[in-house]
């Protein structure tokens, strides 16, 4: 490992363990599985797009922070369906499927499972395994964002919403244009709990067109 990479890794570790959100995760492990919980909470607090009785699909759900948050918001009358290529410990009232959404067969399976259900919201915190090469990482991240958009086109009911992680970069504006085609309102969110120097943003698209 180069000195530059080692220095960068040490800086990240130092920031990670000093992070106030990470500290809160360690204090509330039974309720909050990762700092991603706070990102969804920030966005929900400002936009109130998750409501009682809704059906929510969580893409890239593991370790379960967003699913756990969503299931409390939709209540007993709602439902949460989650999927990830990694395993996820069970969460009460959350249906979980393990598989790679990039795999066409698994994507089609999820689509078929959802096609007769009225899906109100899709949330996606999917991100690729970062290589450290900016362009490669950006393209892989945008591909995952596009998969979430594709799923929303397939299964979201009229007026539904999509919350999807994305990253600023060369293909970002083109992706935003694609989102505008499907949704009447598109908002770019940078939660307080998202690290300031990160290119990570969240796109909240509402008013699914039919």
Swiss-Prot record:
SUPFAM superfamilies: S-adenosyl-L-methionine-dependent methyltransferases. The keyword rRNA processing applies. GO terms for molecular function: rRNA (uridine-2'-O-)-methyltransferase activity. Its EC number is 2.1.1.166. Keywords: Cytoplasm, Methyltransferase, rRNA processing, S-adenosyl-L-methionine, Transferase. GO terms for cellular component: cytoplasm. The active site is at 165 (proton acceptor). Pfam families: FtsJ. It catalyses: uridine(2552) in 23S rRNA + S-adenosyl-L-methionine = 2'-O-methyluridine(2552) in 23S rRNA + S-adenosyl-L-homocysteine + H(+). It is found in: Cytoplasm. S-adenosyl-L-methionine binds at residues 64, 66, 84, 100, 125. The keyword Cytoplasm applies. Specifically methylates the uridine in position 2552 of 23S rRNA at the 2'-O position of the ribose in the fully assembled 50S ribosomal subunit. Belongs to the class I-like SAM-binding methyltransferase superfamily. RNA methyltransferase RlmE family. This is Ribosomal RNA large subunit methyltransferase E.
């Amino acid at each position: 490992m180069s000195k530059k990479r080692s220095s960068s890794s040490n800086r990240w570790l130092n920031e990670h363990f000093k992070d106030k959100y990470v500290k809160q995760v360690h204090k509330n492990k039974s309720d909050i599985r990762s700092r991603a919980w706070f990102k969804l909470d920030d966005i929900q607090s400002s936009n109130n797009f998750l409501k009682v009785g809704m059906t929510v699909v969580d893409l890239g759900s593991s370790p379960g922070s967003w699913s756990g948050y969503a299931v409390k918001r939709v209540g007993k009358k709602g439902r949460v369906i989650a999927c990830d290529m990694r395993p996820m410990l069970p969460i009460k009232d959350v249906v979980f499927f393990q598989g790679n959404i990039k795999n066409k067969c698994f994507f089609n399976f999820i689509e078929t499972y959802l096609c007769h259900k009225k899906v109100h919201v899709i949330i996606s915190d999917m991100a690729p395994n970062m290589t450290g090469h900016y362009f490669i990482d950006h393209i892989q991240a945008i591909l995952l964002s596009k998969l979430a958009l594709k799923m929303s086109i397939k299964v979201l009911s009229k007026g539904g919403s999509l919350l999807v992680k994305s990253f600023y970069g060369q293909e970002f504006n083109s992706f935003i244009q694609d989102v505008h085609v499907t949704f009447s309102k598109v908002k770019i969110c940078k939660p307080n709990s998202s690290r300031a120097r990160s290119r990570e943003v969240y796109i909240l698209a509402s008013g699914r067109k039919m």
